């Protein structure tokens, strides 16, 4: 029964959840109803806040298949609970549909993949006789009951389980009206519905927050106790806070709604049966619809795969990359000579053929009168944009030690409040107080201990940091991440466009003739090369297009095309329509590049002497793919009968697709020489196609059929200069003990060279290349280790002295750990093999891995996860194009983009410079330290006021209404919001701020200040009780309050109620505690090394000085009107001097102790803990400690690590030295 009751959905995915079934129980509902009435509605609030309690209190367990309510719990570390109600989708009254078949198909997960004719074949799999489909909705996704797996499953589109061949064979003709209605019923409306909630709904949701409920409780309590002014002040603060919060939340909803509204309802044309064209609203699109992309472009309302034509698309909304991308039709496997017809379609794998929702189609091109068509594969929230919007609407909780410790500390305050609560009750009973007064005073102590302003105070530093970041061009869509960025100790950088200049300069070319490399050439515009195949490849093999008359495309393509000085011409819409066929993009050399024509000696022969027009038409394009690391085109030279195929890409990849006899024997050596110097090398290849290959066939031929048996033509050498600020920024990060890692799609040796040039790898450091090979022909996976400095000498020397690779920490403290003097480098393929077959080597490689080359987008994400698994706080800085996954996964992802905000990254820098990284870390550290300072101050504020009230309760007195008001508003709020204004320190330092409140130094700081404050308050309180009052005539106020002079005569039951407030003890405690708030604020307002000194925070300094002067003035020179408002008793002048002495000594001791804790506290704790050899908490630090004494690490050159074939689960391995 337990297996039936608890199942798992989205297994293996990020949003994996456990699911439990429940049915409503009437008697439980009745009990809850009674409980709500008895608790005055508090039980209802509790059940609203805790969904698991709500379900368990009102329901009984049931089988998931038959339940009415499901209880969901995430399986990650947060264990968040959700509940959802089961809904039924009625199908009995739907025309043109077989209701029973429909239920069975959905129940078995075949809603899309079956054609209309064979739907009823699924009857035999169904176990349900119901004419209704059961489903629930969670985070905007529908989950239907699936009989095949006996579980709920989300409804898939054509993005899973559909082959490329099936897309052409079964889905390219479009849907019938009946099938469209069938799918519309199941998938619902195609929209990313971001409804902007009404102000009333937002208000109710905000007010029901536990924090505001607690404030409401406090206000009611204070009103009953006649603390009207303070209650009114809290109400005003709460109203302002709620209005501000409502404005911010509603603004975010409106922005998100506007972002998706551009394509929410547009008219689109779709293909129907018998080649009919129907115009429908985009909200009616379903997976399987064949959509026609208009000539003048559109904003895509869904995810669709191109099956006809070509599109130029702007994907900046998704990736942050503003360069237009060319999308071509999905290769038709029916003509695939390699028999790859069963390849499964995937939007990620085939993204160069997929139009994603929300992206803008700028231009389209079609062939021989055929329309540009795309099959809808995903709709609504299942689309790529829908998933991004879901991640914004339903963000994953942020796991940060500071917040966990904050909740723990609040719990401690609740315990302290409980002690005060019990003490107040006992003390009041002993003094025979009325029941009503006992209840009010006891509850009041709770509202004092847990400060209402704590959440607002904690977020102040983050808000100010966000403003400062915006001033330097860094925009943030996840403010809570700013604090986390203060903990970053490793940053991954993309190379091209991030560490190096975005544009590449053409250094030169090196052609191949007769399988030999010619000398390098720097002039590609020479007359001799104009009509060469090499230049023809440079002129045609690109994805450039003209947008509004301006050549646009990939920066590398632009540089290459500009270097040869050719002209690109595209057909206009009118020309295309006139010829009723595709007009290819044509490239031709400018007139000055062509050879001079021969002068005719005879006027009659002049016609024959004119130079022939030389131009090339680009017939078909296979765009660049990060996974394939190449692109190719099919082109035809004017006048030629046969077409040509041109290819460019990574040299290793291009060479592998060429005839071996055309690749020079010294290819690897020449390539290595260039890459070691940091050049970006691109290889070119060419092939004459068969004459039988017609224009029409080319449009449907597969990529693999073209990209093989090519002739190697040579290399293009591009110079990728470092950005001017790169070395300085990396040096700053290294000084701050922040590791830097390069993650790039470029060549390995080029990446290593750039890493050396920018200072990521020092000149004396060793670089070890890990070349991992997957299992093959019965052999296990293995890793070959090479040293880059000794690659050419490997055969001569089989080993290197281990002392040549010193393995020592750069600092004595593990907290200042820096990667030691060797670095690992590997490519994407090796990284994947290591992840799969060498799991126990992964942490070691993460500790010293510095260069990761030829990395695909998903591999970048896996690398970030692997680094996080060894407890690094990882930052990721990239250009946003191929780094979206890694940017989202990292603790702090920074996209270098001109866009003000990007949904792909928590942070976006408007200026494309990595100088934003230290700026972000500095601001993160400042915000983190501000949070610590504010939290410590608010803790002391609570304890000081709690102890003040407890002392006064012992003599049945209390602080006055306006005294509370003055402390909480004039002192606390002013101090909190000004002490958070300290800007970040001007440079990064090696020391890192603590990650949580539960650390020795912080706890000792708070506890010591509590002891000091409590001690001096007690001193003043008990001293004044013993103080003998002088003759009434000595009172400088010349008042006759003899009844209130001596606390021993205060409360005999006949005095006025005002005497409970206006007494020596109250006045003494009020003045001492008021100064204590200011003293701990100054003591806790830390400056260097993370924030500017507090004396540069002018608002804070001025506020503290004004408050100090004002309190000192009314203490030493009483003002009757102020004394009356604050209910202060005018005490003798001598006692004021005594109070001044207490206050001054208190300030001196507090500040001295805090400074001592700052300077020597950490050292003392480290010394104390070193006696018991404390194990480092972070995994990478513990691992570094182990590796210091491992004689087998790092692996020596020319050795091989083989995976054990027997045990594959734990990835265990053995090192075998090859002689």
From Swiss-Prot:
> Hey, which stretches end up on the Lumenal side?
223-228, 427-444, 958, 1017-1066, 1120-1136
Which GO molecular function entries does the Swiss-Prot or TrEMBL record give?
Answer: ABC-type putrescine transporter activity; ATP binding; ATP hydrolysis activity; ATPase-coupled monoatomic cation transmembrane transporter activity; metal ion binding; P-type ion transporter activity; P-type transmembrane transporter activity
- Identify the main location: membrane
Q: Which Gene3D superfamilies match?
A: Calcium-transporting ATPase, cytoplasmic domain N, Calcium-transporting ATPase, cytoplasmic transduction domain A, Calcium-transporting ATPase, transmembrane domain, HAD superfamily/HAD-like
* Ranges per topology, Cytoplasmic: 1-28, 50-201, 250-405, 466-936, 980-995, 1088-1098, 1158-1219
List every range the entry marks intramembrane.
29-49
EC number(s) stated in the UniProt entry for this protein = 7.6.2.16
- Tell me the active site: 494 (4-aspartylphosphate intermediate)
- Which PANTHER family has this protein been placed in? CATION-TRANSPORTING ATPASE-RELATED, POLYAMINE-TRANSPORTING ATPASE 13A3
By sequence similarity, the record places it as follows: Belongs to the cation transport ATPase (P-type) (TC 3.A.3) family. Type V subfamily.
Protein name in UniProt: Polyamine-transporting ATPase 13A3
Q: Tell me what gene encodes this.
A: Atp13a3
């Amino acid at each position: 029964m337990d297996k039936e009751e608890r199942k798992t959905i989205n297994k293996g995915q990020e949003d994996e959840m456990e699911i439990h079934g429940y049915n409503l129980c009437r008697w439980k509902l009745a009990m809850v109803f009674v409980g709500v009435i008895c608790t005055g509605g508090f039980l209802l609030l509790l059940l609203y806040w805790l969904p698991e309690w709500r379900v368990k209190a009102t329901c009984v367990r049931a089988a998931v298949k038959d339940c009415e309510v499901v209880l969901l719990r995430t399986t990650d570390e947060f264990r968040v609970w959700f509940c959802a109600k089961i809904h039924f989708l009625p199908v009995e009254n739907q025309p043109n549909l077989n209701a029973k078949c429909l239920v069975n198909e959905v129940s078995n997960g075949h809603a899309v993949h079956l054609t209309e004719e064979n739907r009823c074949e699924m009857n035999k799999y169904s176990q349900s006789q119901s004419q209704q489909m059961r489903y629930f909705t969670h985070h905007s996704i529908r989950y239907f009951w699936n009989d095949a797996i006996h579980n709920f499953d989300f409804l898939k589109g054509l993005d899973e389980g559909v082959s490329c061949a099936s897309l052409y064979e079964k889905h390219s003709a479009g849907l019938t009206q009946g099938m469209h209605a069938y799918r519309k019923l199941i998938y619902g409306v195609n929209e990313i519905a971001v409804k902007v909630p009404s102000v009333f709904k937002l208000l109710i949701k905000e007010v029901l927050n536990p924090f505001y409920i607690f404030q409401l409780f406090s206000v009611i309590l204070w009103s009953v106790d006649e603390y009207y002014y303070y209650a009114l002040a809290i109400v005003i603060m709460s109203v302002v806070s709620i209005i501000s919060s409502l404005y911010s939340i509603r603004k975010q909803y409106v922005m998100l709604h506007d972002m998706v509204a551009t394509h929410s309802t547009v008219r689109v044309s779709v293909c129907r049966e018998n080649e009919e064209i129907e115009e429908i609203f985009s909200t009616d699109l379903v997976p399987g619809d064949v959509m026609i992309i208009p000539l003048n472009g559109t904003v895509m309302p869904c995810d669709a795969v191109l099956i006809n034509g070509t599109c130029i698309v702007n994907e900046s909304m998704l990736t942050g990359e503003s360069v237009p991308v060319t999308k071509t039709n999905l290769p038709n496997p029916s003509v695939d000579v390699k028999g790859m017809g069963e390849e499964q379609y995937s939007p990620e794998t085939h993204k160069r053929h997929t139009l994603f929702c929300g992206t803008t189609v700028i231009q389209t091109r079609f062939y021989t009168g055929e329309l540009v068509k795309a099959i809808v594969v995903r709709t609504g929230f299942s689309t790529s944009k829908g998933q991004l919007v879901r991640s914004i609407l339903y963000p994953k909780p942020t796991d940060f030690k500071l917040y966990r410790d904050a909740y723990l500390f609040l719990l401690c305050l609740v315990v302290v409040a409980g002690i005060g609560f019990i003490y107040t009750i006992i003390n009041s009973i002993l003094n025979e107080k009325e029941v009503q007064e006992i209840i009010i005073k006891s509850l009041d102590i709770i509202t004092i201990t847990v400060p209402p302003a704590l959440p607002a105070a904690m977020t102040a530093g983050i808000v100010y940091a966000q403003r400062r970041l915006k001033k330097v061009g860094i925009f943030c869509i996840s403010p809570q991440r700013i604090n986390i960025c203060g903990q970053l100790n490793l940053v991954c950088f993309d190379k091209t466009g991030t560490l190096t200049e975005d544009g590449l300069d053409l250094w030169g070319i090196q052609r191949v003739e007769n399988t030999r490399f010619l000398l390098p050439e720097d002039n590609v515009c020479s007359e001799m090369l104009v009509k060469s195949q090499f230049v023809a490849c440079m002129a045609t093999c690109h994805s450039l297009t003209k947008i509004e008359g301006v050549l646009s495309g990939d920066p590398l393509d632009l540089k290459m095309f500009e270097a040869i000085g050719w002209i690109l011409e595209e057909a206009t819409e009118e020309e295309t329509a006139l010829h009723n066929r595709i007009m290819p993009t044509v490239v031709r050399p400018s007139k000055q590049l062509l050879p001079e024509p021969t002068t005719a000696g005879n006027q009659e022969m002049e016609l024959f002497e004119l130079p022939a027009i030389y131009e090339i038409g680009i017939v078909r394009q296979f765009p660049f793919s990060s996974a394939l690391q190449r692109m190719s085109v099919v082109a035809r030279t004017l006048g030629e009968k046969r077409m040509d195929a041109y290819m460019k890409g990574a040299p290793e990849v291009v060479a592998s697709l060429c005839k071996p006899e055309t690749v020079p024997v010294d290819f690897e050596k020449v390539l290595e020489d260039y890459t070691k110097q940091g050049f970006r090398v691109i290889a070119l290849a060419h092939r004459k196609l068969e004459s039988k290959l017609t224009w029409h066939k080319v449009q449907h031929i597969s990529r693999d059929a073209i990209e093989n048996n090519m002739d190697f033509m040579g290399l293009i050498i591009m110079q990728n200069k470092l950005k001017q600020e790169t070395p300085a920024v990396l040096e700053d990060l290294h000084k701050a003990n922040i590791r830097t890692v390069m993650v790039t799609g470029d060549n390995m040796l080029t990446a290593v060279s750039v890493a050396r040039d920018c200072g990521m790898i020092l000149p004396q450091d060793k670089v070890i290349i890990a070349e991992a090979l997957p299992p093959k022909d019965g052999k296990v996976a293995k890793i070959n280790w090479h040293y880059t400095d000794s690659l050419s000498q490997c055969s001569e020397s089989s080993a290197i002295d281990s002392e040549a690779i010193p393995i020592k920490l750069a600092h004595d403290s593990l907290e200042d750990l820096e990667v030691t003097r060797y670095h690992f480098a590997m490519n994407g393929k090796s990284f994947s093999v290591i992840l799969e077959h060498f799991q126990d080597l992964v942490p070691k490689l993460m500790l010293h891995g510095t260069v990761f080359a030829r990395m695909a987008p998903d591999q970048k994400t896996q690398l970030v996860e692997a680094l996080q698994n060894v407890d690094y706080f990882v930052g990721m800085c990239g250009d946003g194009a191929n780094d979206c996954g890694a940017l989202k996964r990292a603790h702090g992802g920074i996209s270098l983009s001109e866009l003000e905000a990007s949904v792909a990254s928590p942070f976006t820098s408007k200026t494309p410079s990595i100088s934003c990284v230290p700026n972000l870390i500095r601001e993160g550290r400042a915000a983190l330290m501000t949070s610590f300072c504010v939290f410590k101050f608010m803790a002391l504020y609570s304890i000081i006021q709690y102890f003040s009230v407890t002392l006064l309760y012992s003599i049945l007195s209390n602080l006055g209404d306006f005294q509370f008001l003055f402390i909480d508003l004039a002192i606390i709020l002013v101090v909190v919001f000004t002490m958070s204004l300290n800007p970040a320190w001007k440079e990064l330092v090696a020391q890192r701020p603590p990650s949580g409140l539960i650390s020795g130094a912080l706890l000792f700081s708070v506890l010591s200040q509590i002891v000091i404050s409590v001690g001096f308050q007690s001193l003043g309180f008990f001293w004044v009780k013993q103080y003998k009052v002088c003759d009434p005539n000595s009172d400088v106020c010349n008042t006759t309050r003899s009844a209130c002079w001596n606390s021993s005569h205060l409360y005999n039951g006949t005095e006025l109620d005002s005497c409970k407030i206006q007494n020596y003890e109250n006045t003494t405690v009020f003045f001492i505690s008021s100064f204590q708030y200011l003293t701990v604020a100054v003591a806790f307002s830390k400056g260097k090394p993370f924030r500017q000194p507090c004396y540069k925070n002018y608002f804070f300094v001025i506020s503290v000085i004004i408050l100090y002067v004002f309190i000192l003035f009314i203490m030493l020179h009483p003002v009757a009107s102020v004394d009356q408002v604050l209910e202060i008793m005018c005490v003798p002048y001598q006692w004021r001097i005594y109070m001044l002495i207490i206050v001054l000594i208190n300030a001196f001791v507090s500040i001295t102790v805090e400074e001592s804790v700052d300077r020597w506290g950490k050292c003392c704790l480290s010394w104390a803990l070193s006696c018991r050899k404390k194990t480092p908490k972070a995994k990478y630090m513990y691992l570094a400690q182990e590796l210091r004494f491992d004689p087998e690490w790092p692996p020596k050159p020319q050795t091989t690590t083989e995976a054990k074939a027997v045990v594959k689960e734990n990835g265990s391995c053995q090192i075998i030295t090859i002689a």
